[in-house]
Amino acid sequence: MTRPPAPAPGRPPFTNPARAVLAVILLGTAVRIVLAATIGLGVDESYMVAVARPVSASYFDHPPLSFWIPAAVAHLGGGMHPLALRLPFILFFAATTWLTVRVGALLFGEQAGALGAVLLNLSPVFSVTTGGWILPDGPLMCFMMATVLALAHALLDPAERRTGAWWLAAGVFSALAMLSKYHAVFLLAGTALFLVTDPERRIWLRRPAPWIAVAIALAGLAPVVLWNAAHHWVSFRFQGGRASPAGVHPLALLASLGGQAGYVLPWIWVPLVVVWVGALRRGPRDPARWLLCCIASGPIIVFTLPSLGGHPGLPHWEAPGYLLLFPLLGAATAARWADGAQRVRRWLLFSAVAFGVLLLVAATQSATGWMERVWPRLATRGDPTLEMLDWSDLRGALAARGLLDRPGLFVAAPGWSQAGKAAYALGPEVPVLCLCTAPHQFGYVHDQSDFLGHDAVIVDRTQGRSAVPELYGKYFAAIDSLGAVELRRDGRPAERLALFYARDFERPYPLQVP
């Protein structure tokens, strides 16, 4: 394994890299715990908690691990408090940070590893959403980085004698990544690309250890395959249908790149792209950088190029690829620091301060909605932080109307995101159905036929006149308005839910569920 040249004389970034990283992990974990306890669940989080039970071998949107975790928390007595549900994901990111340090230290030195981990914690898509929300990205990225660490030991550490054990570890961590999110397939594809293109390490393709690791990794997909085989391969059809081309759209490509830069933060995203391109240019001549590059390139390229066909996708889809570039960025930053570049030090300071300010603004806005009071015009443009507002007032509104104890009553919503919010607010004892054409996992939680003849409360988040009577009129004997409930944030009205009482569910709503 080729290590970088020794740093020039001068004070290194960290006198004690291990202590500095420990401080970053402890501080970051403390901040995430505070945020988890004070800010409600997002749309995706509410949905995942709501459909996690009954426990299933797999789920419509993703492999099962990130659904099993909140189900286990609730079963073990953690209840439905946001902090209890989010805590495992916070701990996953603490582990991801430590693994990033170890990968960077093994390949490029302790200072590089520490700097890569610090920069990782200054990027919102990693430090905030991956680091503290109930999403499959948390366990995915932890196990991806663990796999890369095992591969680095097996392939790039000349002093390593236990290569077979590291290959087995890579297989186990890859299997856990497979249980987390479909992005894990890039671990196998990227490793294969590395072995094929590196002449010195191509010999591993003729040895049993990598193939045993592949078999273990693919075993992680067994629950996914079994569930999909019983449900007409719906997950693969759903995921595969997201990238259907519709001509050539350069602006969509620019929108995708802009979204990625925004989620990572532009002043970190640009250097990540620079070190990635540099590693691509060096190729197999620099095995350490090439290994990271081979695995990172898959998610970045595969989820960016389809945007040229008119589908920008979501900006966090490429994030697992960028994750693996942080050890490279740490190495480049350490080298510039050793050269005495003042711009690097100012850039690090700016990155830390800017991230702190952005986090403070977003967190306080999510909790209080203060920006609308300071700048009322912002309210007319929409507030994305309202997605973090729990619908806790819904339960009180239904209880005040004497509806929660009504036998056989169920709650319905016109979309999976609203159904998720309602289901999380009401708890597992109140059945919630998603009466829409694309209910996602809600289409498998309850069988509509079990509720025929029952009454329902239909919940609709709307700022104007609700279309619920027209939309569902032919499926119920009668639908009457129950008025509205105001969802409050920091004691002030923030959103409005229209409520309807629907009598006698007469026929199932047509779902696009195989």
Locations of regions flagged by a protein language model:
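Membrane-interface transmembrane helices that cradle and orient dolichyl/undecaprenyl
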Residues: 11, 107-111, 147-167
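Short helix- or helix-capping micro-motifs
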Residues: 25, 116-124, 174, 178, ...
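Membrane-interface alpha helices of multi-pass inner-membrane proteins
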Residues: 54, 164-181, 216-218
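Membrane-proximal, lumen/periplasm-facing interface regions of secretory-pathway glyco-
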Residues: 315, 342-407, 417-431, 437-440, ...
